[in-house]
């Protein structure tokens, strides 16, 4: 197999849990229009991307959890909290030119 089922279930759990938790925390589902000039964090981007990155880093370090889904769920919750509360502190908004 190209990718193990444990890893795939972890990635899917990370995507689903990050979108659900970020929607519960009040992030909009999509960024404001026009999307390419928007700096508004949303439930669709960058939350699942950060969750996938955290899951991939954890798997590469050898932490797989029980079935991978628990690791993905934890990464999804952490990425949603980070996006909702800390993202603009880490990456400030660009200045308008």
Curated annotation (Swiss-Prot):
**From what superkingdom does this record's organism come?**
Archaea
User: Which keywords does this chain's UniProt record carry?
Assistant: Cell membrane, Membrane, Transmembrane, Transmembrane helix
Q: Any transmembrane segments, and where?
A: 7-27, 43-63, 71-91
> Can you tell me which family this protein belongs to?
Belongs to the EhaA family.
- Organism (species): Methanothermobacter thermautotrophicus (strain ATCC 29096 / DSM 1053 / JCM 10044 / NBRC 100330 / Delta H)
Q: Which GO terms describe its cellular component?
A: plasma membrane
Binding partners and assembly: Putative multisubunit membrane-bound [NiFe]-hydrogenase eha is composed of at least 20 subunits.
The chain's disulfide connectivity reads: none
* Pfam families given in the database record: NiFe_hyd_3_EhaA
Q: What is this protein called?
A: Probable [NiFe]-hydrogenase-type-3 Eha complex membrane subunit A
How is this protein positioned relative to the membrane? Multi-pass membrane protein
Q: What is its main location?
A: membrane
Query: What are the subcellular locations of this protein?
Result: Cell membrane
Protein function: One of the integral membrane subunits of multisubunit membrane-bound [NiFe]-hydrogenase eha. Eha is predicted to form large electron transfer complex and might catalyze energy-driven reduction of low-potential redox carriers.
């Amino acid at each position: 197999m190209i990718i193990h089922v444990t890893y795939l279930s972890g990635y899917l759990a990370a995507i689903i849990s990050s979108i659900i938790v970020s929607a519960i925390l009040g992030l909009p589902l999509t960024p404001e229009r026009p999307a390419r000039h928007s700096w508004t964090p949303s439930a669709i981007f960058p939350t699942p991307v950060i969750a996938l990155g955290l899951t991939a880093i954890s798997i590469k370090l050898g932490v797989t959890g029980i079935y991978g889904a628990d690791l993905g769920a934890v990464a999804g919750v952490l990425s949603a909290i980070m996006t909702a509360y800390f993202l603009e502190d880490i990456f400030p908004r660009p200045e308008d030119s």
